[in-house]
Design a protein with these regions (language model features):
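N-terminal core-binding DNA-recognition domain of tyrosine site-specific recombinases/integrases
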Residues: 1-77, 95, 250-256, 271-277, ...
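Basic, Lys/Arg- and aromatic-enriched nucleic-acid-binding interface segment
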Residues: 43-46, 50-63, 76, 80-140, ...
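C-terminal catalytic core of tyrosine-transesterase DNA break-rejoin enzymes
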Residues: 58, 76, 123, 127, ...
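Catalytic-site neighborhood detector that most strongly recognizes the C-terminal catalytic loop/helix
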Residues: 92, 96, 100, 151, ...
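N-terminal DNA-binding module of tyrosine recombinases/phage integrases
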Residues: 1-31, 222-238, 318, 330-349
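Active-site/catalytic core of tyrosine-dependent DNA strand-transfer enzymes
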Residues: 7, 182-196, 200-270
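C-terminal secondary-structure termini that scaffold catalytic or DNA-interacting sites
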Residues: 145-156, 161-206, 215, 247, ...
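Short, polar N-cap/turn motifs at the start of nucleic acid-interacting alpha helices
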Residues: 142-151, 253, 272, 291-314
Length: 393
């Protein structure tokens, strides 16, 4: 967060309005600033191959929000009387719908997966709606999967930290704020970045998530295998108490999971999605199961704002839309009393209702018995007549 914010200031805010006194910035100035941003080349092309030359609409929105935040602080400090960014016109960036897997595809992926760490990560992302950083930063002291808890459907995880790679300069600037643990550099070389366990970016991300029994048993098996590895490795194992770790106990970075995920997609010939889309699939699937209970789903995903679910995650799958069309047809266009729905075939008797009637009115049973006896006699005479006709021929 610190690195991205300073990058936005350095690449997009300072070059365009950095020299202006805050008191001189008006709503018109902000409108011109937004106009110029759309014609600013992306700073990413200096370091990476990018598909577009100019800054994207979503990036313009990020720049705008950061500048507005700075001017809000200036208002609080009485540097300026009001924030011109609050009255400026910014077109909302359109959220591109992310491709997701349906439940059948995820089941196929899990059945095909042979990588133990990836298998657990996929289960936690889909069943628990966790971000990859939250999964990789999960420690065993925050995993509650005892037999009584599983039996009572009360197995749960406590999400309070995430694994991330950050710049050392950012750590120094923030004085290690919200950092719980800094991992050493195992290569022995001094690097510009370092792996850390840190507080999630929002308070709502700190949460309790209940887990299905199957996932709890998967975690139990993982812990059993991990303890066996610790016993075999001895002093060669560095125990950081991480749920997802390498055989020597070192933390597993996101890029390792992404590499394994890419390999799995190729081997199983699965649709090309990013790992984070499993979290989107999770939210979508849960909204289907709980009939659109946004608050319950938000509790699992840890979103700060509920509209993130309605805007981004509430995918409507084609199969559901087809079912809706079928139900509409049945409910509106083909009511039960329509001519198209009439069935001219004899209706089968309701045996249960008939028995009840006979029990209530014994004389009805006698009448029915006489009718059946008469019908049987008629059928017998008919058969005899047909037999005589056949003999005469």
């Amino acid at each position: 967060m610190y690195d991205s914010s300073t990058g936005i200031i350095r690449n997009y805010i300072n070059p365009l309005i950095g020299d202006l006194p805050m008191q001189s910035v008006t709503v018109k100035t902000v409108d011109i600033f937004i106009h110029d941003l759309h014609r600013t080349r992306s700073a990413a092309e200096k370091y990476h191959a990018v598909k577009q030359d100019y800054i994207s609409d979503s990036q313009v929105e990020k720049v705008f929000k950061l500048a507005r935040c700075a001017f809000n602080q200036a208002v609080r400090w009485n540097v300026i009387p009001q924030n011109p960014f609050n009255q400026a016109n910014l077109c909302k960036a359109k959220c591109r719908e992310r491709e997701i897997w349906d439940a059948e595809t995820i089941r196929k992926a899990l059945d095909t997966c042979r990588d133990a760490n990836l298998y657990v990560c996929m289960n936690l992302s889909f069943a628990c709606s966790l971000r990859i950083g939250e999964i990789l930063g999960l420690t065993w002291n925050n995993v509650h999967i005892s037999e009584p808890e599983i039996k009572d459907d009360d197995a749960w995880l406590y999400i309070m930290q995430e694994l991330a790679r950050v710049k050392r300069s950012a750590l120094a600037a923030l004085n290690n704020k919200n950092i719980y643990h800094i991992f050493p550099a195992w290569t022995g070389k001094t690097t510009s970045t370092v792996l850390v366990l840190k507080k999630p970016k929002t308070d709502s991300s700190i949460r309790r998530v209940w887990i299905p029994k199957t996932v709890a048993y998967v975690l139990q098996e993982l812990r059993k295998n991990q303890l066996h590895q610790i016993e075999l490795a001895g002093c060669d194992y560095t125990d950081y108490n991480l749920v997802i770790a390498f055989p020597n106990g070192h933390p597993c970075e996101e890029k390792r999971i992404n590499q394994a995920f890419t390999k799995l997609k190729a081997e199983a010939k699965l649709p090309d999605v990013v790992f984070h889309s499993l979290r989107h699939s999770s939210a979508t699937y849960k909204l289907k199961l709980n009939h659109g209970d946004l608050k319950a789903t938000q509790g699992d995903t840890g979103h700060a704002e509920i509209d993130m679910l309605t805007k981004v995650y509430a995918h409507i799958l084609d199969s559901d839309r087809k079912i809706t069309a079928q139900r509409f047809e049945e409910a509106f266009y083909q009511p039960q009393n329509s001519p198209e729905q009439k069935d001219n075939s004899p209706s089968s008797p309701d045996i249960a209702a008939l028995i009840t009637q006979i029990q209530q009115y014994p004389e009805l049973g006698k009448i029915l018995s006489d009718v059946l006896a008469k019908q049987a006699s008629t059928d017998e005479n008919t058969e005899n007549g047909n037999g005589n006709l056949s003999d005469s021929e």
